[in-house]
From Swiss-Prot:
Post-translational modification: The N-terminus is blocked.
Modification Phosphoserine, positions: 111, 467
Species this protein is from: Rattus norvegicus
Main localization of the protein described in the UniProt heading: nucleus
Name of the featured protein: Methanethiol oxidase
């Protein structure tokens, strides 16, 4: 059992202690209506994931936001394991930044975990006025008690990779984390490692570039990101920018969970590879490609070659396995990273995607598969789209999956997702030998929501997880 502590703060003392935490019973995830044709606000869904419950794999609560077309996306906490030593802190508020409207919602999940309620709304004009930032993405809680949220743009939608700071108690906007004028040219995700005085951040593109869909000409014009920015954690400034060789659109970035670690991984979406970043003996940082998913030559698609499009990555809490999703090819992969320089493929499962048999795309040349995968049918439902956001249980034995990336790109690449809504699936993980297997008894079909098909995105457990919590 996990260590009992009567005077500790939120989360767990170490990542390995977290692995001993209780099994997840509910999951929170934002559901989006922007670009679906349904004039309804985005909402936070609560899903029952307890196999013993009569409501297993059902949405048990919906909290609608008060505005339309926010595009909720990712979420974070008011406090987490970085404040484990502070008994005055309680993980009871979920932070929901909007990637399009730039509005921030603070949701009370502490009073009634199965029926969250809105606690506070931070309007875009306050973010714009105090920070000159917009289009907000990743939210992390800090050991200082503050909440830090990455931005992708300025108020006009130009690229600007800065960070909004909120007071973790009042949720007042305090200003920017970075020094004035010290932002990165583009933003997206970030992760910090205080023992080494380092933060790393990634790049998608300017909101004006990505917001209405993907244009390959924008890649040729250099409008999509290809860098990792290395920041001095104490001085709040960029100390190194790593240009990644063959690393287009670096999205999710993760240090190893071990707070002493000096390395981690980033998923590069368009170039469909995983790159390892690491600290050199001299104190500088470098990056190297360690996994490559080959593109497939195809017919009947927007381009002659289809990348895997790695859109989410996760590390198990014991830093043993790396997981990632290929949203276009349709598979999730599991790699043993005991040797981080040479990840070893240990599991793979196809969950839909763009190359299934009987679809509009014909694969002409494939370096990996001998035939196109079968469409995925779960509980009689043919699953539209491909695997996208992933979340691992604390013990590493269950992987939850959703299928929506971002509404405008869903509409472009998987129009049937807009018509049918996304789904939530669950994969059983073999942590002894490696391996992934679909749980045929679990399906949340967001195509059957009361107001019409919705696009469900990132997943969070009430007690924290392997992409929300950072240990210091």
């Amino acid at each position: 059992m996990a260590t009992k502590c009567t005077k500790c703060g939120p989360g767990y003392a170490t990542p390995l202690e977290a692995m001993k935490g209780p099994r997840e019973e509910i999951v929170y995830l934002p559901c989006i209506y922007r670009n679906t044709g349904i004039e309804a606000p985005d909402y936070l869904a609560t899903v029952d994931v307890d196999p013993k419950s009569p409501h297993y794999s059902q949405v048990i609560h919906r909290l609608p936001m008060p505005h339309l077309k926010d595009e909720l996306h990712h979420s974070g906490w008011n406090t987490c394991s970085s404040c484990f030593g502070d008994s005055t802190k309680s993980r009871d508020k979920l932070i929901l930044p909007s990637i399009i409207s730039s509005r921030i919602y603070v949701v009370d999940v502490g009073s009634e975990p199965r029926a969250p309620k809105l606690h506070k709304v931070i309007e875009p004009n306050e973010i714009h006025a105090k920070c000159n930032l917009g289009n907000l993405h990743t939210s992390h809680c800090l050991a200082s008690g503050e909440v830090m949220i990455s931005s992708l743009g300025d108020p006009q939608g130009n690229g600007k990779g800065g960070f909004v700071l909120l007071d973790g108690e009042t949720f007042e906007v305090k200003g920017t984390w970075e020094k004035p004028g010290g932002e990165a040219p583009m933003g997206y995700d970030f992760w910090y490692q205080p023992r080494h005085n380092i933060m790393v951040s990634t790049e998608w593109a300017a909101p004006n570039v990505f917001k209405d869909g993907f244009n390959p000409a924008h890649v040729e014009a250099g409008l999509y990101g290809s860098h990792i920015h290395v920041w001095d954690w104490q001085r709040h400034e960029i100390i190194q920018t790593l240009q990644m060789k063959d690393g287009l659109i670096p999205l999710e970035i993760r240090f190893l969970h071990d707070p002493d670690a000096t390395q981690g991984f980033v998923g590069c979406a368009l170039s469909s590879n995983i790159q390892r970043f690491y600290k050199n003996e001299g104190g500088t940082w470098s990056v190297e490609k360690v996994i490559q998913v080959p593109s497939k030559k195809v017919k009947g698609w927007m381009l002659p070659e289809m990348p895997g499009l790695i859109t989410d990555i996760l590390l198990s809490l014991d830093d043993r396995f790396l997981y990632f999703s290929n949203w276009l090819h349709g598979d999730i992969r599991q790699y043993d990273i005991s040797n981080p320089k040479k990840p070893r493929l240990t599991g793979q499962i196809f969950l839909g995607g763009s190359i299934v048999k009987g679809g509009s795309v014909q694969v002409l040349e494939d370096q990996e598969l001998t035939c196109q995968p079968e469409p995925l049918v779960v509980k009689g439902k043919r699953v539209p789209g491909g695997p996208q956001m992933i979340q691992l249980s604390l013990d590493g034995k269950r992987l939850y999956v959703t299928t929506s990336l971002y509404s405008a790109w869903d509409k472009q690449f998987y129009p049937n997702l807009i018509r049918e809504g996304s789904v939530m699936l669950q994969i059983d993980v073999d942590t002894a030998n490696g391996g992934l297997k679909l749980n045929p008894n679990f399906l949340v079909d967001f195509g059957k929501e009361p107001l019409g098909p919705a696009l469900a995105h990132e997943l969070r457990y009430p007690g924290g997880d392997c992409s929300s919590d950072i240990w210091i």
